[in-house]
Amino acid sequence: MYPYCLKYLTNGLRSKQMINFLCIQNILSARTLKICRFRFLPTPSHPTHKMAQETRAISSISEAANKRARKLSKRRAKKPVEEGSSGHVLLLEIENLIEKPVLANVPFERFQEIEVKISYLSSSGDGIGLVCNDQYAVVVPFTLPGDIVKAKLHFLADTYALADFLEVISPSEDRDDTLIKCPYFAKCGGCQYQMLSYDKQLLQKKRVVEKAFQYYSKLDSSLLPAIKDTVGSPLQYNYRTKITPHFDVPKGGTKGPLIIGFQEKGRRRVMDIEECPIATKTINEEYPKIIEDVQSRANTFKRGATILMRDSATEDGKHCVITDHKMIVREQFGDLSFTFPAGAFFQNNNSILEKFTSYVREQLLNPFGRKEHQRPKYFVDAYCGSGLFSVACSKGFLSVIGVEISADSVRYAEENAKRNNVSNATFIVGQAEKIFSSIETPPNETAMVIDPPRKGCDQSFLNQLLEYSPYRIVYISCNVHTQARDVGFLLSQEKGRSYKIDEIRGFDLFPQSHHVESILTLTKVVS
């Protein structure tokens, strides 16, 4: 019998009294939600008033659970979920799994421990199990399809619950816990897939890209090419060149050591860590010294803070860790070298950057079966930052133009072009509302890279992009869901209907996590 099943009442109740209550029977196997109706007869040997108290307590369980669920749902609803965020994507995936919810009441109690079989792996890396005749979803992190796990519910909504992972009762065929290298895995929110072999991680990330375009682009399947295999990272551990552990300080300050580390999965609290296996070896070597220095000043902090740790190459080929946001970092891959402020954005997996940028350049120049004379001659790098793609993809073009709204970023892009002997690149500071106004290259001979932040492109930028209408667009994104949304918008507009999607491929810049970098190529069909 499932642990949540309500205890049968056999003690003194008034004659003909009827009690309605939920009885969830063996959800894992039968997945049936039954409304049980029982008749109880008075038992002289037990005080009636005591049984009445038990009756009220039992009959209020479902009502109390639902009140709490509604209260929490309303509280969460007040905070709008950002479109394309992990939370937003998870809700959409749950909606697709539960097409027609029919449950009138939440079938569980908050903080209840349950057993559940995981059926799906979400794009956010969390497992999803369906219970109550597939009408209610339970989201459990650090799980895989086929796992039967024990989980503790900490958030209840009308159609789903969020749970803490407690233990594996029966593992999936895909689970291999001997692969786990981090002592904090299954508590820290940084990684999701350490128990999954790397080839299966890549396969899952391909599925994420497929689902994103299926559900987010709103494009007919005939307009979408088959998704290419995800390109793996040469390093699956010790690849991350930047980490940002943080700490909180309670009101009134702290008298003891600070808890410094990363956010615990499903909680708004920081967990103490002493190492991070996905960070570079240099960062892990320096980590204890940096933390010790912060701890020595613990009583001086009046509020929490984030600690920057960025791996930087030195001129003699060695590495150091930079913690000052304003200091200059040196990044090197292949024959290329870049400098930028430690607090600025730059891709955090050095080991895959050569493959990554080479593929982008191929996409910019690839004729895709079209006539050779249609190959682009000019390259515009929007969101150019410190010039990563402008410099790495410059060969083969008559000229390269990097556009950026930050004057500081443009200055570093110019320095990086000079450092790498790129003579055909120029960089301009553009205004957000007229980003392409200074570009004079003929659109039908121009290829463009766009690499926006996680939230994707705003409406103004997309409209300007359609107005300029370059021959080719290579859209790079760290959030495939906002990428799919933006591409769907572009192709739905009158000026965007002349574009065709040539290729979509994921790159694994963050092994062991659910994140996937997606590169999509659009080409204007010219008769």
Curated annotation (Swiss-Prot):
It catalyses: uridine(54) in tRNA + S-adenosyl-L-methionine = 5-methyluridine(54) in tRNA + S-adenosyl-L-homocysteine + H(+). It comes from the Eukaryota. Residues 107-167 form the TRAM domain. CDD domains: AdoMet_MTases. GO terms for biological process: tRNA methylation. It holds the Pfam family TRAM. It is an enzyme of class 2 (transferase). S-adenosyl-L-methionine binds at Q347, Y383, E404, D451. The active site is at C478 (nucleophile), E517 (proton acceptor). Keywords: 4Fe-4S, Iron, Iron-sulfur, Metal-binding, Methyltransferase, S-adenosyl-L-methionine, Transferase, tRNA processing. [4Fe-4S] cluster binds at C182, C188, C191, C276. The keyword S-adenosyl-L-methionine applies. The keyword Iron applies. InterPro entries: MeTrfase_TrmA_AS (IPR030390), MeTrfase_TrmA_CS (IPR030391), NA-bd_OB-fold (IPR012340), SAM-dependent_MTases_sf (IPR029063), TRAM_dom (IPR002792), tRNA_(uracil-5-)_MeTrfase (IPR025795), U5_MeTrfase_fam (IPR010280). One of its GO terms (molecular function) is metal ion binding. Its EC number is 2.1.1.35. GO terms for cellular component: mitochondrion; nucleus. Belongs to the class I-like SAM-binding methyltransferase superfamily. RNA M5U methyltransferase family. Catalyzes the formation of 5-methyl-uridine at position 54 (m5U54) in all tRNA. May also have a role in tRNA stabilization or maturation. This is tRNA (uracil(54)-C(5))-methyltransferase. It comes from Schizosaccharomyces pombe (strain 972 / ATCC 24843). The lineage of its organism: Eukaryota, Fungi, Dikarya, Ascomycota, Taphrinomycotina.
